[in-house]
Regions:
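Positively charged, low-complexity intrinsically disordered leader regions
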Residues: 1-53, 124
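Phosphate/diphosphate ligand-binding glycine-rich loop within oxidoreductases
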Residues: 35-137, 261
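Phosphate-coordination loops involved in phosphoryl transfer and adenosine-cofactor binding
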Residues: 36-42, 144-146, 250
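Glycine-rich phosphate/diphosphate-binding loop of Rossmann-like nucleotide-binding domains
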Residues: 47-62, 141-217
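A short, gly/pro- and small-residue-rich
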Residues: 104-121, 227-248, 273-274
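Rossmann-like adenosine-cofactor binding region
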Residues: 191-268
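Adenosine-phosphate binding glycine-rich loop
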Residues: 250-251, 256-299
């Protein structure tokens, strides 16, 4: 982790990501043990619901023998973020934060002398994608050469998957209705990181999943829950078993969760043997343990 923080996957280079994968395998196999020494303290800030994220980091901190300091803090509301950072600097060894405002997390990191881990913001979900990438390494033996099709709107998860293309030789295709694409400014920023463009966008579901190693999807926007033009548009990219069959017999399916069966994916497709979503969620513990361990050892 080049900056000490993990705010996005752009903070990782290939050796660091490879190390995270190797450590995740060791933690999953029970081969790693928490380092002995001074007790570490990690503040956790979860703004809003965070069922799986809370469980993952709770398991990680417990595995490492780290004392968790849960805080109810809304950055920038009662005091400048710089003041909050100053207090945290003297009290804990790292901060895990999940909040919608990525700019607030970035500002916290700018004023922090300790590592900050982005547990999810509106701009990225790096820890989640690290865990899902680990699951693909388990299933496919590596990430180079893979084709990931993200079916859905421009979301934090879509962006984090795209950021992974700057580390490995994998391709990402976004499938979405017109008007819901990744912004050009984001794609241009990736192009600056890596000269070869590895992200494509299409509005055709069949074309987007053709030859995909994994189809990944996320929940639809709330505006699609009522009948109307937006729901009609998103129904054209609903994943069903026919979608999986057209993609290929070896194609895997992953979902961020929570899932709304009958919206972004049918119940039959989600429960299909090619769906590895629950397997990926079982990997949240070891991968998040590896993440926190790396950050603390660098911080």
């Amino acid at each position: 982790m080049q900056s000490g923080h993990l705010l996005s996957l752009l903070d990782l280079d290939r050796p660091a990501f490879d190390s995270l994968m190797a450590d995740s395998f060791r933690w999953k196999a029970g081969e790693s043990q928490p380092a002995r020494g001074n007790l570490r303290r990690v503040a956790t800030i979860f703004d809003g619901p965070a069922f799986r994220t809370r469980l993952a980091f709770d398991a990680a901190l417990s595995n490492l023998g780290v004392h968790q300091v849960p805080l109810q803090v809304h950055l920038g509301e009662r005091e400048p973020i710089s003041d909050t950072a100053a207090i945290l600097n003297g009290a804990v060894d790292a901060v895990v934060i999940r909040t919608s405002d990525h700019s607030a997390v970035t500002e916290l990191a700018q004023h922090s002398e300790i590592p900050v881990i982005n547990a999810m913001t509106d701009a990225g979900h790096p820890c989640e994608v690290i865990s899902e990438a680990f699951t693909l390494v388990e299933q496919r033996g590596g990430l180079d050469g893979l084709h990931v099709t993200f079916v859905g709107e421009d979301t934090n998860l879509c962006r984090s998957w795209c950021e992974l293309t700057t580390i490995y030789d994998l391709r990402v295709t976004q499938v979405c209705p017109p008007g819901w694409e990744l912004p050009v400014t984001f794609l241009d920023s990736l192009h600056q990181q890596r000269q070869e463009q590895r992200v494509a966008i299409t509005h055709d579901l069949d074309a987007g999943v053709a030859g995909a190693d994994v189809i990944y999807t996320d929940g639809w926007p709330r505006s699609t829950r009522e009948p109307g033009p937006e729901r009609d548009a998103f129904m054209t990219i609903q994943i069903d078993q026919t979608t999986l069959d057209r993609a290929g017999a070896a194609t895997l399916l992953m979902h961020c969760m929570p899932v709304r069966r009958g919206d972004e994916v049918t119940a039959a497709a989600f429960d299909d043997h090619r769906s590895i979503t629950l397997r990926a969620k079982a990997n949240l513990g070891p991968t998040h343990t590896a993440i926190v361990s790396h950050v603390l050892n660098q911080g």
